[in-house]
Amino acid sequence: MLIKALNEYYDILARNDKVCKDGFSKQNITHMIMLRKDGTVSDIINVEQESEPDSKGKTKLQPISVVLPERTQKPGIDGNIVEHRPLYIFGLNYDNKSGTYSTEDSTDKAKKSHKAFVDKNLEFTEGMTSDIVTAYRNFLQKWNPQDETEDELLVNLGKAYSTANFIFGLDGHPEIKLHDTDGEIAQKIAELKKSVGPVQGNDICAVTGEKGEISVTHDKIKGVRNANATGAL
């Protein structure tokens, strides 16, 4: 009874945008990539916010929490729709000692990650026409990591690059972001979630008591004591 009540309460919160809806999750973000409509990068803006003063009166910059399409839980190389990870987006490794960027690594991870990002997002955004998605698609098709190892904006990021998490905005209109809940990408994800059919047939859910599709797997559960930091299965 308690679990069912909690499940119903979560549904109420989701309807009122108090928690993430199905198909979306929260991600800490440090920077916003500003894209011109032709796909070139006009700026990379730090969007971190100053924390409340601690007991000594000191403050620090903290990432903002943003709702993005659900992040992948698959091991190995797998891109996200609206990617936030620098290696996937830019296809570059940063060397802290030399302060330089390179596409090279022993397993070609940078190249493989960037390709996975580009292929997945071009396929998903096919046919979309909004200015921000057009800019994003142009970026996907134009950005060549090998030609961008000395990009001024990335050079200025320096060591922050490796731990940064990104979102995308439209140059001249920072209020328009790729992940906006009323944007084409978010709407497509919501529609896909509604249209997904049964995976392994229907049965009675042990939590809700309602009849529905049976999931083959579930996402990793984070915060479980003594479990892997990336989440428990």
Q: How would you label these PLM feature ranges?
A:
Residues 1-199, 203:
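Conserved phosphate-interacting/catalytic interface
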